[in-house]
A protein has these predicted regions:
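Conserved catalytic alpha/beta core of Sir2/sirtuin-type deacylases, generalized to analogous enzyme cores
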Residues: 1-169
Length: 169
């Protein structure tokens, strides 16, 4: 079972959505669960690097289909084509426009917050290399991860760290 529409955003999703709405921030996520959207991150400030389970298209005609239709039948009732979720599967390439948008965001950021990733899987892990030398990089993770020398690493539970974040400061 891939779909959990009852899943709710946690404090990390909620604070990131607030950052996007109030602080001119963008979110680049590897998650395909749609929780950043559900938390209210504006779509123009969100890059779902590996796609979303909640976007479905027909592989034959290319039309977008409501995701709930995919749960009923894997075939497009219009043309008979096979439906597919808009996610990047293992060894598939990232869509060019997604990669370019992510690189643009990282290149122009003055603050980069890395959260909940090992930074071991490329091309996502390579995005950090596009950060400007003046950008502040802060990572929150339960264990040490490879980061540029100028980055600050907070080792701990990301939910606990984000609960302490105050956007008014």
């Amino acid at each position: 079972k891939m779909f959990y529409p009852q899943a709710k955003p946690n404090v990390i999703h909620e604070k990131m959505a607030l950052f996007a709405k109030e602080k001119n921030a963008c979110v680049i996520t590897q998650n395909v669960d749609g929780l950043h959207s559900k938390a209210g991150t504006p779509q123009n400030d969100l890059v779902e690097f590996h796609g979303s389970l909640y976007r479905v298209f027909c592989q034959k005609c290319g039309r977008s289909i409501e995701w709930s239709k995919y749960l009923e039948d894997m075939h497009h009732e219009g043309c008979g084509g096979i439906l597919r979720t808009d996610i990047v599967l293992y060894e598939e390439p990232i869509r060019r426009e997604v990669l370019e948008r992510a690189v643009e965001i990282v290149s122009n950021a003055d603050l980069i917050v890395v959260c909940g990733t090992s930074l071991a899987v490329y091309p996502f892990a390579g995005l950090i290399e596009y950060a400007s030398k003046d950008a502040k990089i802060v990572a929150v993770n339960k264990e040490k991860i490879p980061l540029p020398e100028n980055a600050e690493l907070i080792i701990g539970d990301a939910k606990e760290v984000f609960e302490e974040v105050d956007l008014k400061k």
